[in-house]
């Protein structure tokens, strides 16, 4: 009886799973847009990410305010999670003098007209407030969403490589 009961649960589980799998729409794929659209989106997002990397040198918070969505969730390598306001405060309070800010091994995946995921490596170098030189490398993944014709970052996570 116990074996039959377990078998019955297994059959029911498989049947329900099969039924539900037909109810779930597949996730967006790169085929959701034409190759031309994907290329245009890739160029736009890449340009914005490159500009973002340069704000380490310029501390252009006006630019960051424009590309960081109000609902931004930014997870730092140490596990701290910042919203937009906290991330801006972190930039404004940073006393490092950055001399180099470079993105490499950068890839964009377009999943629709309004959605892209980016990943890459980021290397920043300079001097801290005490004049000591630093060189930091990170790997990041970011989520860009287009709202009202404007691309913005809604999530970003990075981990320190060195």
Task: Give residue ranges: language-model regions.
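Short beta-strand edge/turn micro-motifs at domain boundaries
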Residues: 24-28, 137-162
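Short, low-complexity N-terminal intrinsically disordered segments enriched in polar/charged residues
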Residues: 23-70
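Bacterial N-terminal signal peptides
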Residues: 10-21
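A solvent-exposed, acidic/Ser-Thr-rich amphipathic alpha-helical stretch
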Residues: 39-43, 60-114, 121, 134-136
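Acidic surface patches and DE-rich sequence motifs
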Residues: 76, 128, 146
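Generic short beta-strand segments
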Residues: 120-127
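Bacterial N-terminal signal peptides that target proteins for export
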Residues: 1-11
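A short, structured loop/turn motif at beta-sheet edges
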Residues: 108-116, 132, 144-150
């Amino acid at each position: 009886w116990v074996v039959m009961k377990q078998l019955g649960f297994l059959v029911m589980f498989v049947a329900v799973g099969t039924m539900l799998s037909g109810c779930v729409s597949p996730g967006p794929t790169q085929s959701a847009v034409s190759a031309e659209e994907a290329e245009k989106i890739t160029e736009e997002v890449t340009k914005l990410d490159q500009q973002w990397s340069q704000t380490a040198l310029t501390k252009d918070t006006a630019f960051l305010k424009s590309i960081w969505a109000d609902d931004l969730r930014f997870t730092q390598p140490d596990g701290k999670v910042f919203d937009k306001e906290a991330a801006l405060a972190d930039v404004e309070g940073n006393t490092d003098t950055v001399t180099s800010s470079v993105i490499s091994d950068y890839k964009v995946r377009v999943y629709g007209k309004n959605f892209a995921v980016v990943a890459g490596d980021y290397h920043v170098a300079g001097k801290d407030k005490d004049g000591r030189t630093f060189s930091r490398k990170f790997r990041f993944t970011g989520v860009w969403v287009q709202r009202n014709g404007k691309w913005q970052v809604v999530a970003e996570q990075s981990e320190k490589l060195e």
